[in-house]
Amino acid sequence: MEQLHFITKLLDIKDPNIQILDIINRDTHKEIIAKLDYNAPSCPDCGHQMKKYDFQKPSKIPYLETTGMATRILLRKRRFKCYQCSKMMVAETPLVKKNHQIPRIINQKIAQKLIEKTSMTDIAHQLAISTSTVIRKLNDFRFKSDFSRLPEIMSWDEYSFTKGKMSFIAQDFEKLNIITVLEGRTQAIIRNYFLKYDRVVRCRVKIITMDMFSPYYDLAKKLFPNAKIVLDRFHIVQHMSRAMSRMRVQIMNQFHRKSHEYKAIKRYWKLIQQESRKLSDKRFYRPAFRMHLTNREILDKLLSYSEDLKHHYHLYQLLLFHFQNKEPEKFFGLIEDNLKLVHPLFQTVFKTFLKDKEKIVNALQLPYSNAKLEATNNLIKLIKRNAFGFRNFENFKKRIFIALNIKKERTKWVLSRA
């Protein structure tokens, strides 16, 4: 009996009225046979003293794993009867709520698991409960928007909720808390949400970082009149890189598919896209050229195949150099000087840059970017991928808020002294 007493401590069952009678090891799980019994209380209806009647049919209560096996408690609860008014009552315990079968410790574990990126089906499988139980616990979470404040620095972006449909997300740049997740990214949806904030609150926003999605520009200016728009530097470089890539493909396709030039440009395309300062000087045998060459020597050979390729490559590298050194005057001076001399693919990018000049200058002068929100989007994609997608947007939204806005305390490890 003393061993069974220690088992109640091990299982963190603090109710002294629960007595463990036996433990049965099944093939797939453990069963803990227990009973709940205490002295008869007064009748809640008439006030007379009730008497012990019999035991209820065992309640099958799922519990946390023990020794790596699923565990459930078969708890027989005492019933009481009032012989004055015939009132029947079942014994109660803090282990589970009245009229419930899921113990509090399992509900706590569900909440803890929801903070992680695990899918709800996996949580249900790990805890030996139904997915519906996990969803009910998810619906217990309530997140209220605080319309009395906004951070001074915000990040805007979008992510894919369903195929072909993008959703909007806004994040506090410094604290990394999610401000809102909206089902669509149209101007009407975003405007209607942020207009819930008073104009005085919106005027306190100083910086908004975003990617190069032009419909956001005018909307941000109207909603946040004092905010500077900072474009994400990654997307600016990406525009130049894509223009260079398309230019390379067009020039490559001018050669015959079986020619040496076509095969060389196709095989070593990364050298053209790569920043020239990062080219390796190590010499290796290159089967395409049948000689030992460095990456820089290969690049020189590729550029010798086309004057257009060489001209646009050097221009591309010079733009990257000025951009990474954060020299907006030289960067835009080079664009303006070459606007009419470059291929239409580059002209399109240059015109976009000139149109968004103020926002790109902000990106070069201010130490803000969308990198933190892009990292958040990767976590959102992970939640979605683990769950094989979501049908219900509200459930998806709650998972995002739980995973990203609720901070999980880290265990502080204490090293033992030798």
Show the residue positions of the predicted features.
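Short, conserved DNA-binding cores of transcription-related domains
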Residues: M1-K87, A91-T93
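Acidic/histidine-rich catalytic cores and adjacent linkers
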Residues: A40, D45, K51, L138, ...
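Short, positively charged, Gly/Tyr-enriched micro-motifs
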Residues: G47, K60-K165, R202-V205, T209, ...
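Non-catalytic alpha-helical coupling and interface elements of nucleotide-dependent molecular machines
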Residues: H48-K51, K87-V90, I115, S119, ...
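Gly-rich Lys/Arg/Thr-decorated short loops/hinges at beta-loop-alpha junctions or inter-strand turns
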Residues: T93, Q171-N177
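Acidic, glycine-enriched active-site microenvironments
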Residues: N99-I110, T121, T180, Q324, ...
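Active-site beta-loop-alpha junctions of metal-dependent nucleic acid enzymes
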Residues: N99-Q101, I179-V201, I207
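Short alpha-helix plus adjacent loop in nuclease-associated cores
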Residues: I236-R257
